[in-house]
């Protein structure tokens, strides 16, 4: 692994699938990278809805859904790993303003850049009663790469990378997220060649 790894850390970035990436889950996907280190990477696909919405998910976990604004929001297929497990990407919620590294939820990854990913049920319980984070993306499963794997895929032109924008995650309609992520790079879909290669 190169010594300048810190310069290429993709935590809090989007991975945007190139047209040549033909995979059922990752084709035309946008992945939010929650963690990237020398050991590998972990992320959530933010533009592939499952066949259930938040209201149905909350019924399955036997919680009321008091947030009308979230009832019809889709649950996403976050990736192929642990697809039976829920991952909640949300704005940071701190227990103590003096300790911004500590979340109010039991099992939370604090992501540099202002978001958190929580896997404990307490975040769903908070949402169910109208408390908790206002902006959330709930996914089943996650995407993972082993040591050097993501870097290899990027060098093979499978992915474009760009600093993440929370508006694309939480405010952009699902069908427009891929194109909006490309626009962060000043690109449009027609500009991308399906044939990978280096000039």
From Swiss-Prot:
GO cellular component annotations of the record: cytosol
Q: Which InterPro entries match?
A: AlgH-like (IPR003774)
- Record-stated family: Belongs to the UPF0301 (AlgH) family.
Q: Which HAMAP family match?
A: UPF0301
Against PANTHER family, the record matches this protein to: UNCHARACTERIZED PROTEIN YQGE (PTHR30327), UPF0301 PROTEIN YQGE (PTHR30327:SF1)
Record NCBIfam families: PRK00228.1-1
What name does the UniProt record give this protein? UPF0301 protein Rfer_1377
Q: Which organism is it from?
A: Albidiferax ferrireducens (strain ATCC BAA-621 / DSM 15236 / T118) (Rhodoferax ferrireducens)
């Amino acid at each position: 692994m190169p010594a300048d790894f810190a310069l290429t850390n993709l935590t809090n970035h989007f991975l945007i699938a190139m047209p040549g990436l033909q995979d059922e889950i990752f084709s035309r996907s946008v992945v939010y990278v929650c963690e990237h280190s020398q050991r590998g990477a972990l992320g959530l696909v933010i533009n592939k809805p499952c066949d259930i919405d938040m209201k149905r998910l909350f019924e399955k976990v036997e919680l009321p859904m008091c947030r009308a604004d979230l009832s019809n929001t889709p649950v996403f297929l976050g990736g192929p790993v642990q697809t039976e497990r829920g991952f909640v990407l949300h704005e940071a919620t701190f227990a103590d303003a003096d300790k911004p590294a500590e979340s109010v939820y039991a099992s939370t990854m604090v992501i540099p850049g202002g978001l958190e990913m929580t896997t404990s049920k307490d975040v769903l319980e908070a949402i169910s009663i109208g408390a908790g984070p206002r902006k959330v993306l709930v996914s089943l499963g996650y995407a993972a790469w082993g040591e050097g794997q993501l870097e290899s895929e990027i060098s093979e032109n499978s992915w474009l990378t760009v600093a993440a924008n929370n508006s694309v995650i939480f405010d952009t309609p699902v069908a427009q997220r891929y194109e909006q992520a490309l626009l962060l790079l000043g690109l449009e879909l027609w500009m991308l060649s399906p044939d990978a290669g280096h000039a």
